[in-house]
């Protein structure tokens, strides 16, 4: 079928909304009418080249929610009319990682940047006569998509789509970074550095886990104000102010758990994050840097002598088929504030405006809300 999609044709160029053609669902595939897509910083990394796909053009978008319209042969766990969320990490449940309980590290994830279908290695989307590389096997910046069932999670149909799409990446990643990867325990002091969608979700995770103090570090003033509404106890504009403030509040003990959720991770900043990490504490690097950045500034002696831990994480260490429904059930129960994380809704044609707003610090999370005009 022919529809629209937001593409990039080369690095550092605006998104181009234009006609694309999507194939019909094959074995184990699901066709979805998209209703909402989250505008995550990781898609901007496609533009800058910090996270390059295997080729161009690229169809962006890896957070999304919609309605199943058609299923391919062999699909018996989804049916037309189902409300679903797209998980940016596929999960087969069968590979060694999935069997070991690390479904966020599923072997199917090896193809996240390759653009080839999990089903048969083909390209299922074309534009201007060329194969299109969809972000993380999805490409939610289009009002329709065909995707392998391993990336699809059924949800409660009463959950608004603009909220549901956030748990496909940002909310699950942030919340899981706190409660699972950092393993925040009651009474822990926690610092969150960077307050976009992932950071605000990590903040809520720390509060939910029973943190004593939650220190939020963010240069944008209105985001610091929002952090207080989400449960932060102290806010600081930068890491130097946080160093002094956290030292004063904790009598020099610092934060047992530090979670880094800045827009782009820079190796030169890692040592500064460890200065606010307590002895024996853990610094979780949730943010991602350039795939070619191999330089890290780190005081190795202090890392050893103070027994500090640096831990990477993807998808918050979670299981998409478990965590996505669980987090949405918490939202329904009033235990997770997702409504206030959606700052602005955009049309697909406004995607460049949305990303400029993100870069200007105006959004916690922008969302593309699809209409009939987009289709």
UniProtKB/Swiss-Prot annotation:
Q: State the Gene Ontology BP annotations.
A: formaldehyde catabolic process
Q: Where in the cell is it found?
A: Cytoplasm
The EC number of this protein is 1.1.1.1
Cofactor annotation: Zn(2+)
Q: Which GO terms label this protein's molecular function in UniProt?
A: alcohol dehydrogenase (NAD+) activity; S-(hydroxymethyl)glutathione dehydrogenase [NAD(P)+] activity; zinc ion binding
The UniProt record gives the binding positions of Zn(2+) 1 as 40, 62, 169
Report the top EC class in one word: oxidoreductase
Q: State the InterPro entries in the record.
A: ADH-like_C, ADH-like_N, ADH_Zn_actinomycetes, ADH_Zn_CS, GroES-like_sf, NAD(P)-bd_dom_sf, PKS_ER
Record note on cofactor: Binds 2 Zn(2+) ions per subunit.
Q: Which residues participate in Zn(2+) 2 binding?
A: 92, 95, 98, 106
- The signal peptide here is none
The family line of this record is:
Belongs to the zinc-containing alcohol dehydrogenase family.
Q: Tell me the protein's name.
A: Alcohol dehydrogenase B
Native organism: Mycobacterium tuberculosis (strain ATCC 25618 / H37Rv)
Which gene is transcribed and translated to give this protein?
A: adhB
């Amino acid at each position: 079928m022919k529809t629209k999609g937001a593409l990039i044709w080369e690095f550092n160029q605006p998104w181009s909304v234009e006609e694309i053609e999507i194939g019909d669902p094959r074995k184990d595939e699901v066709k979805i009418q998209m209703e909402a897509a989250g505008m995550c910083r990781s898609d901007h990394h496609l533009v800058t080249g910090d996270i390059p796909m295997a080729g161009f053009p690229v169809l962006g978008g890896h957070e999304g929610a919609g309605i199943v319209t058609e299923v391919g042969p062999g699909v018996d766990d989804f049916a037309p009319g189902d409300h679903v969320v797209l998980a940016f990490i596929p999960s087969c449940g069968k590979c060694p990682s999935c069997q070991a309980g690390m479904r966020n590290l599923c072997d199917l994830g090896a193809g996240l940047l390759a653009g080839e279908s999990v089903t048969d290695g083909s390209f299922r989307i074309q534009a201007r006569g060329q194969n299109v590389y969809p972000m993380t096997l999805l490409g939610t910046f289009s009002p329709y998509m065909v995707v392998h069932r391993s990336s699809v999670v059924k949800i409660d149909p009463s959950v608004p789509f603009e909220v549901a799409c956030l748990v496909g990446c940002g909310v699950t990643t942030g919340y899981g970074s706190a409660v699972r990867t950092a393993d925040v325990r009651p009474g822990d002091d926690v610092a969150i550095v960077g307050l976009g969608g992932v950071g605000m979700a990590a903040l809520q995770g720390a509060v939910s886990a029973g943190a004593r103090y939650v220190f939020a570090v963010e240069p944008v003033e209105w985001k610091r104000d929002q952090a207080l509404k989400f449960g932060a106890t102290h806010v600081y504009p930068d890491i130097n102010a946080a160093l002094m403030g956290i030292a004063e509040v904790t009598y020099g003990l610092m934060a047992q758990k530090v979670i880094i959720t800045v827009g782009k991770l820079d190796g030169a900043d890692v040592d500064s994050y460890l200065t606010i990490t307590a002895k024996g504490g853990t610094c979780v690097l949730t943010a991602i840097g350039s795939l070619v950045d191999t330089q890290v500034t780190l005081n190795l002696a202090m890392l050893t002598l103070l027994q500090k831990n640096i831990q990477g994480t993807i998808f918050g260490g979670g299981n998409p088929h478990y965590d996505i429904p669980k987090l949405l059930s918490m939202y329904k129960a009033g235990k997770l504030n997702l409504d206030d994380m959606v700052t602005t809704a955009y049309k697909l044609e406004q995607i460049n405006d949305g990303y400029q707003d993100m870069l200007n610090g105006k959004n916690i999370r922008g969302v593309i809300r699809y209409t009939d005009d987009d289709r």
